[in-house]
Amino acid sequence: MAKLILIIVTQILLIAAVVSARKGENFAKTIDKKHFGLRKEKLTHFRVYWHDILSGSNPSSVVINPPISNSSFFGSVTVIDNRLTTEVAVNSTLVGQAQGIYAATGQRDASALMVMNFAFKTGKYNGSSIAILGRNAVLTKVREMPVIGGSGLFRFARGYVEARTMWFDQKSGDATVEYSCYVLHY
């Protein structure tokens, strides 16, 4: 009798598991992109200047975790709210902010992990943003990092950016970097 009860209970549990698994299949479904008003995909190129200011009374970048040694920047983590402008000069026309963090990840080279959003504040792209996540080999003339997403007019964005250092002050750590952005979006 105990064997029969064990077999019946096992079968009931097995049936319940199968029914439960089928219900889980309905959590995702394919939908038509037209429901989101997505039209033809386009490629947008724009150039902005990223101003990383660590010095002065109102820095836009703050080191929240100092490096683990004096011989390298490895381990350093910096939070940013950097100006994005149309020209190299820091006081040129503001188009947005670069907000995020960068962390010195190279023990033997000057490389950083960049995690940031370019949040646009003017013109057609006001309120839209792109998300950049990637390795920045800081001493390389041209660095390429992926665009992994976006919001607003850049919803479903993908692409890449090329970063070129325009100016760097070794004493303060302040820098201006040109970001040439190539973004596919709808």
From Swiss-Prot:
Residue span of the signal peptide, if any? Answer: 1-21
Provide the residues annotated with a glycan attachment (glycosylation). 70, 91, 126
Q: Which Pfam families match?
A: Dirigent
Please provide the record's keywords in A-Z order. Apoplast, Glycoprotein, Secreted, Signal
Instruction: State where the protein is found.
Output: Secreted, Extracellular space, Apoplast
Q: Which InterPro entries match?
A: Allene_oxi_cyc_Dirigent, Dirigent
The Gene Ontology biological process annotation of the record reads: phenylpropanoid biosynthetic process
Please give the GO cellular component terms listed in this UniProt entry: apoplast
Q: What does this protein do?
A: Dirigent proteins impart stereoselectivity on the phenoxy radical-coupling reaction, yielding optically active lignans from two molecules of coniferyl alcohol in the biosynthesis of lignans, flavonolignans, and alkaloids and thus plays a central role in plant secondary metabolism.
Q: Which family does it belong to?
A: Belongs to the plant dirigent protein family.
How does the annotation summarize its subunit structure? Homodimer.
For this protein, the record's PANTHER family field holds:
NUCLEOPORIN-RELATED
What's this protein's name?
A: Dirigent protein 7
State which gene encodes it.
DIR7
